[in-house]
Amino acid sequence: MSTLNQAHCEACRADAPQVSDEELPILIKQIPDWNIEVRDSIMQLEKVFLFKNFKHALAFTNAVGEISEAEGHHPGLLTEWGKVTVTWWSHSIKGLHRNDFIMAARTDEVAKTAEGRK
Protein backbone atom coordinates (compact mmCIF):
# COMPACT_ATOMS: atom_id res chain seq x y z
CA MET A 1 0.00 0.00 0.00
CA SER A 2 1.36 3.38 -0.99
CA THR A 3 1.96 6.02 1.64
CA LEU A 4 2.74 8.56 -1.06
CA ASN A 5 -0.99 9.31 -1.38
CA GLN A 6 -0.96 10.60 2.21
CA ALA A 7 2.20 12.69 1.90
CA HIS A 8 2.38 16.39 1.11
CA CYS A 9 4.63 18.20 -1.31
CA GLU A 10 7.58 20.22 -0.14
CA ALA A 11 8.67 23.46 -1.78
CA CYS A 12 10.79 22.58 -4.80
CA ARG A 13 13.58 25.02 -5.61
CA ALA A 14 15.69 25.13 -8.76
CA ASP A 15 18.59 23.62 -6.78
CA ALA A 16 16.52 20.74 -5.36
CA PRO A 17 17.84 17.30 -6.25
CA GLN A 18 16.05 15.15 -8.78
CA VAL A 19 15.00 11.65 -7.74
CA SER A 20 18.15 9.51 -7.73
CA ASP A 21 18.67 6.33 -9.75
CA GLU A 22 18.39 4.42 -6.46
CA GLU A 23 15.12 6.10 -5.42
CA LEU A 24 13.42 5.80 -8.81
CA PRO A 25 12.60 2.05 -8.76
CA ILE A 26 11.39 2.27 -5.16
CA LEU A 27 9.05 5.18 -5.89
CA ILE A 28 7.74 3.85 -9.21
CA LYS A 29 6.70 0.58 -7.52
CA GLN A 30 4.32 2.64 -5.39
CA ILE A 31 2.55 3.96 -8.50
CA PRO A 32 2.77 0.91 -10.81
CA ASP A 33 0.26 2.10 -13.42
CA TRP A 34 2.23 5.24 -14.25
CA ASN A 35 4.73 5.37 -17.11
CA ILE A 36 8.02 7.22 -17.22
CA GLU A 37 8.23 9.27 -20.40
CA VAL A 38 11.21 11.34 -21.55
CA ARG A 39 10.49 14.53 -23.50
CA ASP A 40 13.24 16.98 -24.40
CA SER A 41 15.57 15.00 -22.09
CA ILE A 42 13.17 15.55 -19.15
CA MET A 43 11.78 12.54 -17.28
CA GLN A 44 8.05 12.77 -16.59
CA LEU A 45 5.36 10.56 -15.04
CA GLU A 46 2.32 9.99 -17.23
CA LYS A 47 -0.95 8.10 -17.05
CA VAL A 48 -4.12 8.05 -19.14
CA PHE A 49 -7.47 7.85 -17.35
CA LEU A 50 -10.52 6.72 -19.36
CA PHE A 51 -14.07 7.97 -18.84
CA LYS A 52 -17.51 7.34 -20.31
CA ASN A 53 -17.82 10.84 -21.76
CA PHE A 54 -16.38 14.35 -21.86
CA LYS A 55 -18.37 15.58 -18.85
CA HIS A 56 -16.81 12.95 -16.57
CA ALA A 57 -13.34 13.57 -18.01
CA LEU A 58 -13.71 17.30 -17.37
CA ALA A 59 -14.91 16.73 -13.80
CA PHE A 60 -11.83 14.57 -13.14
CA THR A 61 -9.59 17.25 -14.65
CA ASN A 62 -11.10 19.80 -12.27
CA ALA A 63 -10.65 17.45 -9.29
CA VAL A 64 -6.97 16.99 -10.15
CA GLY A 65 -6.75 20.77 -10.45
CA GLU A 66 -8.12 21.15 -6.93
CA ILE A 67 -5.51 18.87 -5.33
CA SER A 68 -2.82 20.55 -7.43
CA GLU A 69 -3.78 23.98 -6.17
CA ALA A 70 -3.90 22.72 -2.58
CA GLU A 71 -0.34 21.35 -2.86
CA GLY A 72 1.08 24.11 -5.06
CA HIS A 73 2.29 21.55 -7.61
CA HIS A 74 0.65 21.38 -11.03
CA PRO A 75 0.59 18.74 -13.79
CA GLY A 76 0.19 18.83 -17.51
CA LEU A 77 -3.44 17.95 -18.19
CA LEU A 78 -4.84 16.98 -21.58
CA THR A 79 -8.61 16.57 -21.47
CA GLU A 80 -10.29 14.88 -24.43
CA TRP A 81 -13.59 13.13 -25.02
CA GLY A 82 -13.54 10.21 -22.59
CA LYS A 83 -9.89 10.58 -21.72
CA VAL A 84 -7.56 12.61 -19.49
CA THR A 85 -3.79 12.38 -19.77
CA VAL A 86 -2.02 13.51 -16.60
CA THR A 87 1.70 14.29 -16.70
CA TRP A 88 3.74 15.13 -13.61
CA TRP A 89 7.26 16.58 -13.52
CA SER A 90 9.00 19.38 -11.69
CA HIS A 91 9.56 22.29 -14.04
CA SER A 92 12.07 24.04 -11.79
CA ILE A 93 14.49 21.09 -11.76
CA LYS A 94 13.63 19.82 -15.25
CA GLY A 95 12.95 16.30 -14.05
CA LEU A 96 11.34 14.16 -11.39
CA HIS A 97 11.17 15.09 -7.72
CA ARG A 98 9.49 13.12 -4.91
CA ASN A 99 6.61 15.62 -5.20
CA ASP A 100 5.74 14.18 -8.61
CA PHE A 101 5.34 10.70 -7.18
CA ILE A 102 3.26 12.05 -4.31
CA MET A 103 0.95 13.82 -6.71
CA ALA A 104 0.70 10.80 -9.03
CA ALA A 105 -0.42 8.72 -6.03
CA ARG A 106 -2.87 11.41 -4.99
CA THR A 107 -4.20 11.55 -8.57
CA ASP A 108 -4.85 7.80 -8.36
CA GLU A 109 -6.80 8.41 -5.14
CA VAL A 110 -8.97 11.01 -6.88
CA ALA A 111 -9.54 8.57 -9.74
CA LYS A 112 -10.85 5.88 -7.37
CA THR A 113 -13.95 7.95 -6.66
CA ALA A 114 -14.25 9.72 -10.01
CA GLU A 115 -17.63 9.31 -11.64
CA GLY A 116 -17.81 7.68 -15.05
CA ARG A 117 -14.49 5.81 -15.01
CA LYS A 118 -14.04 3.06 -17.57
UniProtKB/Swiss-Prot annotation:
InterPro entries: PCD_sf, Pterin-4-alpha-carb_dehyd, Pterin_deHydtase. Keywords: Lyase. It comes from the Bacteria. GO terms for biological process: tetrahydrobiopterin biosynthetic process. Gene3D superfamilies: Transcriptional coactivator/pterin dehydratase. It catalyses: (4aS,6R)-4a-hydroxy-L-erythro-5,6,7,8-tetrahydrobiopterin = (6R)-L-erythro-6,7-dihydrobiopterin + H2O. Pfam families: Pterin_4a. Belongs to the pterin-4-alpha-carbinolamine dehydratase family. This is Putative pterin-4-alpha-carbinolamine dehydratase. The lineage of its organism: Bacteria, Pseudomonadati, Pseudomonadota, Gammaproteobacteria, Pseudomonadales.
